[in-house]
Design a protein with these regions (language model features):
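Catalytic Walker B motif of ABC-type/P-loop ATPase nucleotide-binding domains
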Residues: 158-161
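ABC transporter nucleotide-binding domain
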Residues: 176-264
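Conserved ABC ATPase "signature" region
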Residues: 100, 104, 111-129
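Conserved ABC transporter NBD signature motif
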Residues: 60-71, 75-76
């Protein structure tokens, strides 16, 4: 499988001496749904800016589907659709004109531009707003408009910088469904987000960047398995005592008849069952509670 994005030794030092990127390497395979996570100031936006030729790199190389941004910039840019974090279109243009005019920058005929504009506006539930000035749209509609604009020339690589910031939960999930659909049709997607649930739900692979360096770069499933502890939820037959303590284990009473127990991966719950039995508590069922990406994110940044 070919590489949609290949970054080698990428550095960026700003005029004030701040080193935003410290020689990072990053590869994204064609067809992947890839998450780039990191705290504010970690280097995410700088990386995206360089990929899209909005920021000038200090050193290193960037290729998009084999096209170097140094020697084949025009070809590289044709492969990319970018959905920036901030709204960056005219407040007075209509939804229709914003999408159709964007297609013109990539050499599409008017007829083809209009066909694609209709397709994406319908898919993103904006067709009824096509003659509306962008300033009249809600924040969620503006987000969807930016996605339609980014897709109208049908790039093979879509980059989304915080695409659901400020979007309500229902709309966010509908956007997730749309992004999954276009990824399944073959579009490679790179996502930056502060909603860790978003990355966990959508992405197959993930890189975590911190202080201009890659702290982790692996499959999402592999990353989640790296958590050192597992949490189990125990349901009990009788109400639990007001206070309950089990030596050597971290416990948390979440309901009258529900107890969470954390232990090292591979550890045994036998001692927990024995301790509860001694306190007159019978366990009726047990389930593993999935560790969330937030925990791992904090853990990795602490290590780096």
């Amino acid at each position: 499988m070919s590489k949609a994005l290949e970054i080698r030794g990428l550095r960026k030092v700003y005029d004030n001496g701040f080193e935003a990127l410290k020689g990072i390497d990053l590869c994204v395979e064609e067809g992947d749904f890839f998450a780039l996570l990191g705290p504010n100031g970690a280097g995410k936006s700088t990386t995206i800016g360089i990929i899209c030729s909005l920021v000038k790199k200090t050193a290193g190389s960037v290729s998009v589907f084999g096209h170097s941004i140094d020697s084949e910039l025009a070809l590289a840019k044709k492969e990319i659709g970018i959905v920036p974090q901030e709204f960056n279109f005219s407040n007075f243009e209509s939804v229709w004109d914003i999408v159709v005019n964007q297609a013109g920058y990539y050499g599409l005929t008017r007829e083809l531009a209009e066909q694609r504009a209709e397709t994406y506006l319908r898919q993103l539930d904006l067709w009824e707003k096509r003659n509306t000035a962008s300033r009249m749209l809600s924040g969620g509609m503006k987000r969807r408009l930016m996605i339609a604009r980014a897709l109208v020339h049908e790039p093979r690589l879509l980059i989304l910088d915080e695409p659901t910031a400020g979007v309500d939960i229902e709309l966010r999930r509908s956007m997730w469904a749309f992004l999954k659909e276009i990824n399944q049709r073959g579009t490679t997607i790179i996502l930056t987000t502060h909603y860790l649930e978003e990355a966990e739900s959508l992405c197959r692979n993930i890189a975590i960047i911190d202080s201009g360096e890659i702290a982790e770069n692996t499959a999402m499933k592999t990353l989640l398995k790296q958590l050192h502890r597992e949490t189990f939820v125990l349901d009990t037959k009788e109400p639990l005592p007001d206070t309950i303590s089990i030596a050597g284990f971290e416990t948390h009473k979440t309901d009258e008849q529900m107890l969470e127990v954390a232990l090292e991966k591979g550890g045994s719950l036998n001692a927990v069952f024995a301790a509860l039995s001694e306190q007159g508590v019978e366990v009726t069922s047990m389930r593993n509670k999935a560790n969330r990406l937030e925990e791992l994110f904090v853990s990795l940044l602490a290590k780096s």
